[in-house]
From Swiss-Prot:
Lineage of the organism: Eukaryota, Metazoa, Ecdysozoa, Nematoda, Chromadorea
Gene3D superfamilies reported in the protein's UniProt record: P-loop containing nucleotide triphosphate hydrolases
Top-level taxonomic group: Eukaryota
PROSITE patterns: RECA_2 (PS50162)
Protein encoded by which gene: rfs-1
Name of the protein described by the UniProt record: RAD51-like protein 1
Species of origin: Caenorhabditis briggsae
UniProt entry keywords in alphabetical sequence: DNA recombination, DNA-binding, Meiosis, Nucleus
Length: 244
């Protein structure tokens, strides 16, 4: 055999597992192209960072809908300062049966919180909920906004909350947090400051490509010398769409 004619094709660990039929080890959205970037592993904590209207919540809707459709007993915790828009989430569920959709939504445990103490109580309660597999904390900067201004007390609160998030992951629960971004010297950075940013290793940046376009993108920066990986998507009445 002429070894000079042997060719190799690079693939990530995620692509290898998918090729071997083990993609059930990951959490998915409705778009395979997004899943290749996110590579969401159960029992980890992730954060989506982006401006208002960038598509962070829509990504969470898609993730939640996919889990409800594929894991028949799984429960999802949804923590937010505003009520969950079940009508918007339902657009990501492919079923046209209203009763089936209602049954799926019944497996979402909603916690409306505005104060840190309520966030603590909600995280504790969800950690003890049977069959809880995913916890989404929407706009955590709205709940922890004061911690960005009080350096000592704020850091203690952020440590406490991040430890409670890790407690969820140690129980095998996946955590997805959404956070707004601020701009420092023209560069985007997660809200709540550098210390909070250091508490969550797995981050994704979600952005709208332009004001005139419905195209969004989600990207991640890998460690070391690896380049940023980005994929585009659109938001439609039926959920997320791939950009061809």
């Amino acid at each position: 055999m002429d070894s000079s004619k042997i060719t190799f094709e690079y693939e990530t660990a995620y692509e290898l597992l998918v090729r071997l039929g083990a993609d059930g080890l990951f959490l998915h959205t409705s778009l395979p192209t997004l899943n290749k970037v996110l590579e969401l592993v159960p029992g980890k904590c992730y954060e989506l960072d982006g401006d208002i209207g960038s598509g962070k919540t829509q990504l969470c809707y898609s993730l939640a809908a996919k889990l409800l459709l594929t894991k028949k007993t799984a429960k999802i915790g949804w923590i937010s300062a505003v009520p969950l828009r079940t009508d918007h989430l339902s657009q990501h569920i492919s079923s046209t049966d209203a009763d089936e959709t209602s049954h799926l939504l019944d497996r979402i445990v909603c916690k409306r919180v505005e104060m840190v103490s309520e966030l603590r109580d909600s995280l504790n309660a969800l950690c003890e909920t049977i069959n809880m597999q995913l916890v989404i904390v929407e706009n955590i900067d709205a709940i922890l906004h004061d911690t960005a201004y009080d350096r000592e007390m704020g850091r203690n609160v952020q440590i406490d909350i991040s430890e409670r998030l890790r407690k969820l992951t140690r129980s095998g629960i996946t955590v997805m947090v959404t956070n707004h971004i601020t701009y420092w010297r023209g560069y985007p950075a997660p809200a709540l400051g550098n210390f909070w940013a250091s508490q969550i290793e797995n981050r994704f940046f979600v952005e709208r490509r332009s004001e005139e376009s419905n195209v969004r993108s989600v990207s991640t920066m890998r460690g070391g010398n690896e380049k940023t990986i980005r994929v585009d998507f659109e938001i439609s009445d039926g959920g997320l769409k791939a950009v061809v």
